[in-house]
Amino acid sequence: MPTISLENVTKYYKANKHSRAGRTVEIGVEEVNLTIEQGDFVFVTGSSGAGKSTLLGLISGQLKPDRGTVYLDGKDLSKLLRWNYNRTALMFGKVSPEYALIRKLTVEENLSLAARVGRGKFESNREMHARIQKVLGLVGMTGVEKKHPVEMSIGECRRVELARALINSPPILILDEITASLDDDNIWDIFHLLTEINHKGSTVIMATHASQYVNIMRRRVVTIVDGKIFGDVRQGRYGDVM
């Protein structure tokens, strides 16, 4: 299982017309130093625009730092992606607004599409479809294979998005606001699912606004303020308080 390290990582964005006078760039994150060990469960918290999504994008290799380096098991992530994109990209399972389910495809078709990204991962269609059944069962969504996203609730869609992220058995889950717009029951259901997945060895890195739940979960909490890490606290384990 891989370790992720960020060393002096900075990411800029081109400033828009509403930026302060004279500013040509906006800071996404600045001088970030962070290590995430295998099997960690990390909440990334902060206000809207603080840099949470940028941090997750850098960790997964979706974004390239302007300064500093992101390492995966001691190797430069950007170089790993250049040398073997498919193999490296499959280390990460992602859920974010940018990776919403494709509305015109069924649940099965959405998951099949994600599975085919991992060329060579499945030796046959039968093996791939067995994996689809397994991950849907894992997230409590057995029997929805032929449904389209518009036929499901937001909570059900999030579960399917999580199943899609798990389809290629990635060791690292990157989750950007997976609980957004969900009610309390659905939020707790997602947290319970993620706890089970984490207990099986997966690293879980989750950006969220739901700070009231984060404190109860008693996991590692990284807080970002204006693109900088303001706090990094290990609170214990969820099972300790249940």
Question: Would you name each region that the model predicts?
Answer:
Residues 76, 125-144:
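Conserved ABC ATPase "signature" region
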